[in-house]
Swiss-Prot record:
Cysteines engaged in disulfide bonds, as pairs: none
EC supergroup of this enzyme: transferase
CDD domains found in the cross-reference section: TMPK (cd01672)
Name under which the protein is recorded: Probable thymidylate kinase
Amino acid sequence: MNKFIVFEGIDGSGKTTQAKLLADYLNGIYTCEPTNGEIGQLIRKVLGGKNCEKESLALLFAGDRVEHIKEIEHKLIENMVICDRYVYSSMVYQSIQGIDIDFIASINRFAKIPDVLIYLDVSIEESLKRMGDRDSKEIFENKEILQKVNKKYMNIINERLFEPKNGYILINTDNKTVEEVHKEIIKKLMDKKIIL
């Protein structure tokens, strides 16, 4: 049976790189949130600095996820699906903006439970260094917010909110090459028997 694997972590942790590498390794399908659909494109504009009420942004993410889940379920029929960000990002980022976690959970109650969540941990300093190489910045990319984001992710994992079927894999990416992190991900997925 094909697996639904989610990557999470603060900006600059290596999520996108590692999700794409894993999708290639497994001959699976890479996907991300926000998606490239109509709603996802609107979300990207808001994240780029366009004004939007925080509740509206949370609802946009939930709406984008409805479309995304239909796509994921269809793709899982034939392939593994590797997702770069998912409902956990909504729980983290929207709660930091002051939205009640119960509201976030309520508007995302339809979300498919992943088989495993891979959390890529990175120091704030390394995250900022890696993001310094990027051409564009988003509204959540500064030291104070990154610290809050990391703490929220740890709370979600420790409290087992929206717990994946096979739990969590935590990997620190500080001072490791892309290849070293990729090998560690493969090993831990094999240890959990997610992949053979």
